[in-house]
Design a protein with these regions (language model features):
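Short acidic active-site motifs
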Residues: 31-32, 214
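Short acidic loop-to-helix transition motifs that present clustered carboxylates
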Residues: 27-31, 52-53
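ALDH superfamily catalytic-core signature
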Residues: 10-16, 21, 38-39, 44, ...
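Short catalytic-loop micro-motif centered on adjacent basic/acidic residues
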Residues: 21-24, 44-47, 227-230
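Substrate-binding/gating loop at the entrance of the active-site cleft, primarily
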Residues: 1-9
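Short acidic-hydrophobic, aromatic-tinged amphipathic segments that line or gate anion-handling sites
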Residues: 24-27, 82, 205-210
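Conserved C-terminal structural/oligomerization subdomain of aldehyde/semialdehyde dehydrogenase
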Residues: 41-42, 100, 116-118, 122, ...
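Short gly/pro/ser/thr-enriched loop/turn and capping motifs at secondary-structure boundaries
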Residues: 1-2, 52-55, 77-81, 236-237, ...
Length: 315
């Protein structure tokens, strides 16, 4: 962060822009973020982090004498629905791809596929047999902080305590965790909110549905997500329509191929979603439209000629 800030300052100087255009504040405690949100000269806030931290900062933004916009990107479990048709066609290839996505960056991507929604059947049984060893071969690097590693271990244990069974308990080498794969029934997932908590790290929870009809119910229980991935919905069927409809209702980005961990910075990107994925699902925190979060429209009615000549910018 310090190196990037130094580079930014050099660019500002080279372009003749004010040195204070972009600032850098560093600190380990929550008081740093709270202090920034409370500062009277701050006109808007943005945040990427935990649901708990984002909710606290949003409350601070709303508690100001003059509340300010707050754009928080919070928790997301990013369901990946792998339908039997896709697994039958290329299950082994998809298992390898998915294992890499789960462990990418030690699972510390906000778009990490933390929930795998599968439908009972021979294709699913075979896929799990392919995914488990593929994931076991992954060697995650250490997490960003010791606190994050501790939270990861606690999160995995919380899933077990809520009724999930472990399919893979990768043995990490401290301070790096091992990959984890767990499994639970769709009904239990729907009934127990603890199973829907984000576990930030190299793990994924398989939710097994008894039929295609249960898939939309599982997605609805998630509530909000940055992404939903749907593999195998290539045919126009009533079941596929229902699944895709549910996906669009809870996510900002719905993928029909690939994995969600890649987030392209493009005009078409939508990186946000209903709570708890973000505090403002109408906006994106990645892509061209992300700049619009910090712009405010102003109408200049019957403006004088001098102001029009300046393009509406008074000074």
């Amino acid at each position: 962060s310090q190196a990037v800030c130094a580079m930014i300052q050099r660019v500002l100087q080279a372009q003749g822009l004010p040195a204070g255009l972009i600032g850098f504040v560093q600190g380990a405690g929550i008081e740093v973020g709270v202090g920034l949100i409370r500062h009277p000269l701050i006109a808007a806030g943005a945040f990427t982090g935990s649901t708990r931290g984002g909710a606290a900062l949003q409350a601070e933004a709303n508690a100001r004498p003059r509340p300010i916009p707050f754009y928080g990107e919070l928790g997301s479990i990013n369901p990946l629905v792998a339908l039997p048709a896709a697994l039958a066609a290329k299950g082994a290839e998809l298992a390898t791809t998915l294992a890499g996505s789960i462990s990418l960056g030690c699972g510390q991507f906000c778009t990490n596929p933390g929930l795998l929604v599968l439908v009972d059947g021979p294709e699913t049984d075979a896929f799990i047999q392919q995914l488990t060893p593929a994931l076991a071969q992954q060697k995650p690097h250490p997490m960003l902080t010791a606190g994050m590693r501790k939270a990861f271990d606690a999160g995995v244990q919380a899933l077990v305590d809520a009724g999930a069974s472990s399919l893979l308990q990768g043995e990490g080498v401290a301070p790096a965790p091992g990959p984890q794969l767990l499994q639970v029934s769709a009904q239990r997932f729907i009934e127990h909110a603890e199973l829907r908590e984000e576990v930030f790290g190299p793990s994924s929870l398989i939710v097994r549905c008894a039929s295609l009809a249960e898939v939309p119910q599982v997605l609805a229980a998630v509530g909000g997500s940055l992404t939903v991935t749907v593999w195998g919905a290539d045919e126009d069927t009533a079941a596929h329509r229902a699944i895709v409809r549910s996906a669009t209702q809870i996510a900002g980005r719905v993928l029909f191929a690939g994995v969600p961990t890649g987030v392209a910075v493009t005009a078409a990107q939508q990186h946000g979603g209903p709570w708890p994925a973000s505090t403002s699902p109408m906006t994106t925190s990645v892509g061209d439209a992300a700049l619009e979060r910090f712009l405010r429209p102003v109408c200049l009615q019957d403006a004088p000629a001098w102001l029009l000549a300046r393009g509406g910018v008074p000074c």
